[in-house]
């Protein structure tokens, strides 16, 4: 199909926006971008014209840390469920995602799911690969985990995991644990991003193979004026930082601190969403724990957050209420993550030749329509 989206408020990249622009789609790709809708006369008869009447157009969102949605989780999803997850993500504007395998899995469970997901690519939202949140995590920062499944880093185990899959893109590790540096180097050498999280690490524990921090502030030591914790390190602007911006995992005033002081190119919005996302309020089981969903909170019976129940789009609304610009929201929700994984030449901005993964929204960021690989999905 060939579409011409006109009278659109185009958020192009982290610096540019066109208030009355136009964007042409030919097949899977963006075929042209116009700074003003009055520039389209020469090509208008070749496309199906769609008047957006000033609505926002942004690149599709990339959620690099999510565990599932609507009772379906990556820890045990088969290919049919993966298609359903892919569709529900697309409806929320998440056109690309990593499947996060949780620390509730044994090594044997990891093996099985790595094998299951090896040849999956995403029927709707794109499946870009796997994030292993475990098993090499600190028992001091369990989250909702089972301490028996938190293991010491084991290079042979990682090598065995890598024999099962070519799709591993990221692993979360507690970098202070003995053997972590050897695992980190191996992963780095195999183009897998190394994230430090569920960790008691401080600055001295890190090395050149660490790429960033998993869900900043959560499951790590807090900011300190003498100990250089991972939170302190985040403000050095040397590492990428996952940020859950639901207003619960990180207080809104602390979110302001982050966006005002951490380099805008280093922040990656993630949901860390649970299988209770998109469900009604009530009681659910997640990662072998009984949890309660109430509004935007999902909490175990002993008071711990068990992941979120929001979308990237929901988090963008929170940040917009804090005064974040549309161009910065593009960075946080899309481009930074694509750049982190080396995919930014194909995704993450509205530029000629890139994939037409688009989210159409009103000025309050309510999603109206989606395009995935140039295919229209009505919300």
Task: Briefly describe each language-model feature range.
Residues 159, 163-280:
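Active-site core of metal-dependent hydrolases
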Residues 54, 132, 187, 213, ...:
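Conserved, mostly hydrophobic/aromatic
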Residues 66-67, 83-110, 125-138, 165-176, ...:
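Divalent metal-dependent hydrolysis catalytic cores, especially in the metallo-beta-lactamase
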Residues 55-57, 64, 74-126, 149-164, ...:
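Alpha-helical scaffold segments that flank or form the walls of functional sites
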Residues 88-98, 139-165, 207-220, 233-240, ...:
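Active-site gating loops and adjacent loop-to-helix segments of metal-dependent hydrolytic enzymes
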